[in-house]
Amino acid sequence: MNYHFNHESLADFSSNIRKEWAVTNGIGGYAGSSIIGAHNRTHQGYLIASFHPSVSRYMVFSKTNERFCQMGNTYDLTTAMHSDHRLAEGQKYLQGFDYDGTVCFSYSAGQLSFKKYISLKPDANVSAVAYEFDNSGAEVEFTITPLMNFREHSESS
């Protein structure tokens, strides 16, 4: 099953935070979040591993946050609702969301466009996040911050 959402349908945080995706690894683990990249449940992340299938799941890889500097401008692509209800609205740079068994977020800001892919290895507790960049030529300093964790998947951190 394939899904596509374009920029116009992704721009609003509140109307998209409840639209979710999920990918499973076949042994009880999974990845999942919203189509704008912000988690809205304690059990969402890029790898919720099942070490003892069906009874024991742990959040081990929550997500990645991206930001970059180009030509003196900083672009923070983080999308999140913080505990004080402050929003980080990186989804305003989101050009598309695609799901075909692999998740793909397409972003564009400044003179940089890039795609972020998220996938799980079948039959293993392994998550992959890959990036594909299209830069117009201006130098870019790109920072990826992985948010790791180790907690029971329904506990809050």
Q: Across the structure, where does each feature detected by a protein language model lie?
A:
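Terminal accessory carbohydrate-recognition/targeting modules of carbohydrate-active enzymes
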Residues: 1-157
